[in-house]
Amino acid sequence: LGVFAYLLSKRKGKDEIVEQRLRQNTLKIADEIVSKSGKDLYRRPFERYYWGCNGTLARLTVNLFVADKLNPDKKYKNTAYDTVAHIFGRNYYNRSFVTGLGLNPPMNPHDRRSGADNIIDPWPGYLVGGGHSAIDWIDEEGSYSHNEVAINWQAPLVFALAWLLN
């Protein structure tokens, strides 16, 4: 985030060489995200699955946002849309990874507030971590490695949604 703040800052006196390198690297990474998305059946911008990978997907949209600010190109926003679509149900499981939203959302996040309130539906709006492989996700409260919720995953998802709605 510090790199992005530096790049988007209007502050005078920034080091031009540092700014140029950061700009080039940011655009290169964003272009790699776009390329990887184009190679995936579900337009998911990376191949690996691991604990919290949905949070990584959400964070990639921040990279795409900054790239779009530096070098406006619809490919960045389109890839962000595809990434969010994956999170909300355009995926192998044909279901959303956000409680209360999207297609067939998770019902059993690893979250004490949702699990202990004696209400069937979980608190809405939580992004859960996701599977460890394309076909390995289970909707069980006790499965923290699949269904954990974390603030550092929620924040970039909210950011992505705000950008895409703007």
Predicted regions and their residues:
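Aromatic (Trp/Tyr) and acidic
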Residues: L1-K39, E47-N166
